[in-house]
A protein has these predicted regions:
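Active-site-proximal specificity loops/subdomain of glycosyltransferases
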Residues: 47, 51-106
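Short, charged/polar "capping" segments at the starts of alpha-helices
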Residues: 13, 42-49
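Short beta-strand-to-loop acidic/aromatic patch adjacent to the donor-nucleotide binding site
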Residues: 103-118
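Short beta-strand/loop segment that forms part of the nucleotide-sugar
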Residues: 34-42, 63-68
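Conserved donor-nucleotide/metal-binding helix-loop-beta segment in metal-dependent transferases, i.e.
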Residues: 117-138
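Short, acidic, metal-binding catalytic loop of nucleotide-sugar glycosyltransferases
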Residues: 21-33, 54
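N-proximal low-complexity "stem/linker" segments adjacent to membrane-targeting elements
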Residues: 1-22
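Short coil/turn segments at secondary-structure boundaries
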Residues: 16-19, 49-52, 120-124
Length: 138
């Protein structure tokens, strides 16, 4: 099992991500130690270093997914949504599950850059899924 994010180099999203990753570590992953996979469209080395430095004990792996921002024509069809949101939604709807980074993982917890944990998580959700097949659909 693993936790994953999809991010870009946007300053506001990175600020949220740093808060989220610290919250994930403090309230969940320091105890359960699942890898954190960050799919991105070109994070700079400096940005990646700052993300890893935020929680030095956490296993964070970065994977480039190329340019997944929709074309102007595609964006015009769905003008109520930002291009970045559309791209993340499209990637998470299927392609993420075929990415080689997920080989060997049975479960994936998808978090947004603005996700956070306000309190400790005392139960391992992945262990719960493994131990109770009625919780799993599919």
């Amino acid at each position: 099992a693993a936790v994953h994010y999809v991010v870009n180099e946007d300053a506001e999203h990175l600020k949220e991500l740093l808060f989220s990753i610290e919250s994930l570590w403090m309230h969940f992953n320091e105890r359960f130690d699942y890898p954190v996979l960050i799919f991105h469209d070109g994070l700079s080395p400096k940005t990646r270093e700052s993300i890893v430095a935020k929680t030095p004990g956490q296993r964070i792996w970065f994977f480039s997914v190329g340019n997944w921002v929709p074309s102007e024509a595609q964006h015009a069809l769905h003008s109520n949504f930002g291009a970045g949101y559309m791209a993340q939604s499209r990637f998470r709807s299927g392609p993420v599950f075929h990415h080689e980074a997920l080989d060997g993982f049975d479960y994936l917890w998808s978090l947004d850059s603005d996700s956070h944990f306000p309190a400790p998580v005392d139960v391992d959700p992945f262990l719960q899924l493994h131990s109770n097949p009625e919780l799993v659909i599919g």
